[in-house]
């Protein structure tokens, strides 16, 4: 008869510990997402790899405001994306342009360092970049660019 109260107490303690752990993990994830800014992403409504890149951003704690539009060429021109750096989608975060399949870790670094540039770009659609998984991965570079279109290498993957 004494075994039952002990089991009930042990079970209750285990349940409380599990509940507290789950709450701590949720709070940690919420805190991470709350600290990262919203990225506005312009993309064509039918673009599948854009959806993959957006999922990558969300997985890494970003909140994303998606703007589906068939007018991507006009948007890139209006925002000032240099023509030689274009890809399939364009993002804006904290005043920086993010062109193409830029990894979330590079966006994190950009936002931490706050360089005086217009943005980051991964020209084209290299296999193996976020949103372009599958197939044989290619080496690619993340480039910085300024308003005149001058580029430098920010990261190599």
Question: Where does each model-flagged region fall?
Answer:
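Short, functional N-terminal and low-complexity linear motifs
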Residues: 22, 39-44, 57, 73-79, ...
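Local sequence-structure signature of Cys/Sec-based thiol-disulfide redox active-site neighborhoods
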Residues: 34-54, 60
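Generic cytosolic/nucleocytoplasmic N-terminal low-complexity/intrinsically disordered segments
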Residues: 1-2, 35, 113
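Active-site-proximal beta-strand/loop segments in catalytic clefts of secreted hydrolases
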Residues: 42-44, 67-70, 101, 123-125
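Thiol/selenol-based redox catalytic cores and closely related redox-interacting motifs
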Residues: 78, 84-157
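N-terminal targeting signals for export/organelle localization
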Residues: 1-30
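N-terminal, post-signal-peptide region of Sec/Tat-exported proteins
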Residues: 52-89, 93
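Stable alpha-helical elements in mature extracytoplasmic
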Residues: 46, 53, 68-71, 103-107
């Amino acid at each position: 008869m004494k075994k039952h109260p002990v089991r009930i107490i042990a079970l209750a303690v285990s349940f409380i510990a599990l509940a507290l752990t789950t709450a701590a993990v949720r709070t940690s994830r919420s805190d991470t997402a709350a600290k990262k800014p919203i990225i506005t992403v312009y993309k064509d409504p039918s673009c599948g790899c854009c959806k993959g890149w957006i999922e990558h951003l969300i997985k890494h704690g970003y909140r994303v405001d998606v703007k589906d539009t068939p007018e991507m060429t006009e948007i890139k021109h209006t925002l000032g994306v240099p023509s030689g750096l274009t890809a399939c989608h364009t993002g804006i975060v904290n005043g920086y342009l993010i062109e193409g399949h830029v990894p979330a870790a590079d966006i994190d670094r950009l936002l931490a360092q706050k360089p005086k540039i217009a943005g980051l770009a991964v020209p084209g659609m290299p296999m193996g970049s976020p949103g372009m998984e599958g197939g044989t991965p290619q080496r690619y570079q993340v480039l910085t660019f300024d308003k005149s279109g001058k580029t430098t290498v920010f990261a190599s993957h």
